[in-house]
Amino acid sequence: MLDRLSALEDRYEKLNDLLADPAIIKDTNQLREVSKEQSQLAPTVEVYRVYRDKMEAYQEARHMLTDPEMRDLAKEEVAVLEPEIKDLETKLKALLLPKDPNDDKNVIVEIRGAAGGDEAALFAGDLFKMYSKFAEKQNWKIEIIDASYTELGGYKEIIFIVKGSGAYSKLKYENGAHRVQRVPSTESGGRIHTSTATVAVLPEAEDVEVEIHDKDVRVDTFTSSGPGGQSVNTTQSAVRVTHVPTGIVASCQDEKSQIKNKEKAMKVLRARVYDKIQREQQAEYDEKRKSAVGTGDRSERIRTYNFAQNRVTDHRIGLTIQKLDRILQGEMDEVIDTLVMEYQARASEAAN
């Protein structure tokens, strides 16, 4: 591991030199590629340098244990450094794991009210607000593609793009069924109801990753509608696109322009086709390797939001946090960071 880390540090220094090279600076494409590789290596190199410094201090402290005058002080330093070094080794092993090629991509998120009728649709709206506030804290941008409203202001379905560095790496663990336990605003008897909403997170696919031929796409136009099904546009600006070979459908009615709606719908269609290809490839890989590592099936109930107890429980990793109010305000870091570390640990264990 140390030889590999040393080689990565050498490569990192070489990339820094290239970023100062006038020839690289003039070439926009090359500059972008070098900058991207340098930024990807930076976290690993930074942790490695801290680890190396700690190891040097640890070796020095161990050496001082033979000195009667310094023994007590050295023991204290060794006791402090040992857990720090162990923690850094765990981080380095995780950083050296193969990266998910989709981690730096923008994502398309689809939220749908499931079991629970109007209450499920309202909860879908709460999830959308939670992700919107989390995205704002990450300096990401959100762009709504399509939404189907209920009369009470919830969402039967809402589809949106999250644009920003590392969006997929943090949001990919949100795939699945989210359960809410609370007293609905429409409940006069004060009884707690259980409802669910489903979340799908797809990496945005580029044209070069998924080739969709015009002849394979059927385009239909229709009049866009707003809350309660009311028409909000008398022209047929809403667009529905169908990928005929797979039967995958996407639609958009958020823009007034039919052209813009088609562009957005095609983004969703491309992401869904890309996701289908990836899931088929993963299923084939899992069958061959009997892999148990994954981000959880979408049909799983992955998380429960209990309003009465101000509690959020992630069932995949047994995590319970009594901060529901803050999590719904977008303070999701504790949940997401714990998920990332857990799945990295599982991947590291599977790799060894």
Curated annotation (Swiss-Prot):
Pfam families per record: PCRF, RF-1
GO molecular function, one term: translation release factor activity, codon specific
Recorded superkingdom: Bacteria
Keyword Protein biosynthesis attached: yes
Main location per the UniProt record: cytoplasm
Compartments, record wording: Cytoplasm
Xref: SMART domains: PCRF
Residue positions where N5-methylglutamine is found in the record: 230
Entry GO terms, CC: cytoplasm
Keyword list, A-Z: Cytoplasm, Methylation, Protein biosynthesis
Job description of the protein: Peptide chain release factor 1 directs the termination of translation in response to the peptide chain termination codons UAG and UAA.
Family in the record: Belongs to the prokaryotic/mitochondrial release factor family.
Classification via PANTHER family: LD18447P
Official protein name in the record: Peptide chain release factor 1
Native source organism of the sequence: Exiguobacterium sibiricum (strain DSM 17290 / CCUG 55495 / CIP 109462 / JCM 13490 / 255-15)
Lineage: Bacteria, Bacillati, Bacillota, Bacilli, Bacillales
